[in-house]
A protein has these predicted regions:
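Gly/Ser/Thr-rich active-site cleft segment
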Residues: 1-106, 170, 214-217, 245, ...
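Short, well-ordered alpha-helical packing segments
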Residues: 5-8, 29, 114, 174, ...
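Glycine/Thr-rich phosphate-binding loops that ligate phosphate moieties of nucleotide
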Residues: 12-16, 35, 135-146, 150-375
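A residue-level structural signature of the nucleotidyltransferase/glycosyltransferase Rossmann-like core
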Residues: 19-21, 124, 162
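ATP-dependent carbohydrate kinase catalytic cores
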Residues: 50-154, 164-165, 187-198, 263, ...
Length: 375
């Protein structure tokens, strides 16, 4: 909805000529089928509160300040057919005319499906440029520190949360503190991120008293503060760049743990299985740190194509392909790759640092805001 308002306020001519406001997946479906649909998961969440959550239809009085009701797409399930590939689309894409096209959804939702989030207690942690978490729940949770939606799977709700820096933080460290690793990558072909890990596993848990608050680009949940800043707490002259890098990996893990605990603080919410997905799972040390900080097993999938795999699964459900009659059938097609088991000795060490981490934002947010106001 904010994007529609931005177009309305900043590009009124474009707004006036707009036939439909669509998501990325809806746009592709429309180009392929000439039908304008959006899946329930995105429609009710991204366009909130323009659709009635019970009827899935636009509410005229709520749409009035934003757009006309007829400018919104029809809401249906992600696995419902959007239509079939038209002759014109077939010529442009090479797809066979008449190929069924499902409604589809966004990347994170599809990747959650590929990670088995098809029932309560199943969770995906997506390690991309940012960290995104989706946990299947039996009911909607009322907590302004977290997000909640009716999930893609009919009858399943979810809690979602996000840490604004994940892979983007490791990239910043690579570019600013490990430029020699980049140079070596050019010469040897060995990935710079792999080179950055040399010796980091020798730094003890807690990075010798160095805690990173990874709010380098503001923060989403649980603080929802675009003015939040990153902090290196406990930095001394004895720390090396290896300490700084490990502390960054730990800081993201502390953020994840803070949010997992917050989710499970709600009645009838439990985390029974975690699948980690995305580019960050290639960093085995990071995955082990997350397991040790959270005290939970972190599973990685055997198939790592992520959202595309989830899309393929939903397409199979949509056309009722044998063995894919419903979402429950998907579990048998999700195979586990590496499992990172927590070291509970390290978990106890991390609990001490977690307690400090949990207080860092509240202790400094006023100063953060003073700092950003001066810039």
């Amino acid at each position: 909805m904010p994007k529609i308002l931005w177009i309305k306020n900043n590009e009124p001519e474009v707004y006036a000529r707009t036939y439909k406001f669509l998501t990325g997946s809806s746009f592709l479906a429309a180009k392929l089928t000439d039908n304008y649909v959006v899946d329930r998961f995105l429609g009710l969440a991204s366009f909130n509160p323009l659709y009635d959550p019970k009827t899935w239809r636009p509410v005229p009085e709520l749409c009035a300040p934003v757009c006309r009701p007829d400018q919104l797409a029809k809401v249906q399930e992600a696995t419902d057919l959007a239509g079939y590939v038209t002759e014109a689309a077939a010529k442009e894409t090479g797809l066979a005319p008449g190929t069924p096209v499902i409604t589809g959804t966004d990347d994170s939702g599809a990747e959650a499906i590929s990670a088995g989030v098809v029932e309560p207690g199943k969770m995906m942690i997506q390690f991309g440029s940012s960290i995104y978490m989706i946990l299947g729940t039996r009911h909607l949770v009322d907590d302004e520190r977290l997000w909640r939606e009716q999930f893609i799977v009919p009858g399943l709700c979810d809690i979602s949360a996000g840490t604004n820096t994940g892979g983007s933080l490791t990239k910043w460290y690579r570019d600013e503190l490990f430029s020699d690793a980049l140079e070596q990558e050019k010469k040897t072909g060995i990935d710079a991120y792999q080179l950055m890990l040399e010796g980091v596993d020798q730094v003890p848990p807690g990075s010798d008293g160095l805690i990173t608050l990874p709010y380098f680009a503001g923060e989403r949940t649980p603080v929802n503060d675009p003015l939040a800043c990153g902090i290196l707490f406990g930095l001394t002259i004895s720390h090396t760049r290896r300490h700084l890098y490990r502390s960054a990996l730990e800081g993201v893990a502390y953020s994840i743990q803070q949010q997992l605990r917050l989710m499970e603080s709600h009645e009838d919410v439990s985390i029974d299985q975690i699948f980690a997905v995305g580019g960050g799972v290639n960093n085995a040390l990071w995955m082990q740190i997350v397991a040790d900080v959270t005290g939970r097993e972190i599973n990685t999938p055997d198939v790592t194509v992520g959202a595309s795999y989830g899309d393929a699964m939903m397409a199979a459900v949509g056309v009722r392909h044998p063995g894919f009659e419903n979402f429950s059938c998907l579990v048998q097609h999700i195979k586990t790759g590496t499992v990172y088991k927590p070291d509970f000795k390290k978990y106890k060490i991390y609990q001490k640092y977690q307690a400090i981490y949990d207080k860092l934002y509240d202790s400094t947010c006023e100063l953060m805001h003073m700092m950003t106001e001066e810039q």
